[in-house]
């Protein structure tokens, strides 16, 4: 059995802590034979435990404490602490591991409630579960999610060589916004969501780049951001935004412009990797 969970890109500009999309990088968990102890084989970051201390197993045991230990093989091309939902993918995989091994028969909505309680907000875990574009909210123990197709566009991701942890990225945000600022910020977010749902990427792109909630505070933490945005816009992009808490920079591109923008960014002397990504429409799935 193999559990597959997509990467996710959250916020998408003004959709702060509430909007995310599933993308074509993946965490895969191969569930192998029963074992005396939990064993997680991987060639990932050496900081990631290879026993029951692994977050994947911790999550599974929270839901089903009596499941028999297994040998697991973990592979992932979702980079750690880069704003592509690496921790959310593990949380969703852990829930699915318990769901499969303990035969919990959880619905997607039940998975979402559990994942949101663990993660604190649904913007990454929701698209990891459902796939596609998800607009979600969590308030007073109530979680809501609306799943929609993402408009016809490509994603070009610049993933820097350096990490930017969410806690650091949140420290630069203001403690409060004035009433006037909040109204302006929410109106921009409303336009961005409406345009995405309608499929109008030109209007969506302008709104995405006009965010007032977080981007202007975080952009100075990512030294390549302004150059990428300038080059992408000059060559016909819809928008450039910070993926999640960063430092990944995401360019939304018309499909006929993607190759030009991708090649142009490849020629720059940026210290990181550049990928063309597509929307994942399935979310978490199990191959048996």
Curated annotation (Swiss-Prot):
It comes from Streptococcus sanguinis (strain SK36). Its main location: cytoplasm. This is Homoserine kinase. Its EC number is 2.7.1.39. It is an enzyme of class 2 (transferase). HAMAP family: Homoser_kinase. GO terms for biological process: threonine biosynthetic process. One of its GO terms (cellular component) is cytoplasm. The gene is thrB.
């Amino acid at each position: 059995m193999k559990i597959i969970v997509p990467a996710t890109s959250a916020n998408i500009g003004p959709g702060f802590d509430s909007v995310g999309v599933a993308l074509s990088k993946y965490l895969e968990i191969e569930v192998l034979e029963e074992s005396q102890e939990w064993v997680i084989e991987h060639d990932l970051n050496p900081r990631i435990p290879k026993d029951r201390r692994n977050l994947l197993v911790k999550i599974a045991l929270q839901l089903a404490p009596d499941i028999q230990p297994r040998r697991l093989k973990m592979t992932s091309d979702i980079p750690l602490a880069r704003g592509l939902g690496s921790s959310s993918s593990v949380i969703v995989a852990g829930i699915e591991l318990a769901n499969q091994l303990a035969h919990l028969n959880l619905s997607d909505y039940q998975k979402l409630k559990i994942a949101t309680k663990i993660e604190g907000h649904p913007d990454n875990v929701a698209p990891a579960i459902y796939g596609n574009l998800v607009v979600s909210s969590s308030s007073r123990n109530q979680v809501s999610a609306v799943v929609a197709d993402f408009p016809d566009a490509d994603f070009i991701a610049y993933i820097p060589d350096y990490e930017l942890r969410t806690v650091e990225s949140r420290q630069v945000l203001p403690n409060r916004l004035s009433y006037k600022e909040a109204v302006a910020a929410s109106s921009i977010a409303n336009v961005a969501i409406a345009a995405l749902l309608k499929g109008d990427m030109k209007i969506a792109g302008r709104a995405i780049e006009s965010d007032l909630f977080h981007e202007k505070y975080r952009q100075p933490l990512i030294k390549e951001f302004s150059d990428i945005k300038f080059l992408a816009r000059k060559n016909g992009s819809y928008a450039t935004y910070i993926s999640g808490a960063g430092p990944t920079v995401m360019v939304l591109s018309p499909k006929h412009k993607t190759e030009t923008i991708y090649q142009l960014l490849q020629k720059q002397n940026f210290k990181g990797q550049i990928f063309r990504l597509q929307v994942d429409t399935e979310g978490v799935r199990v191959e048996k």
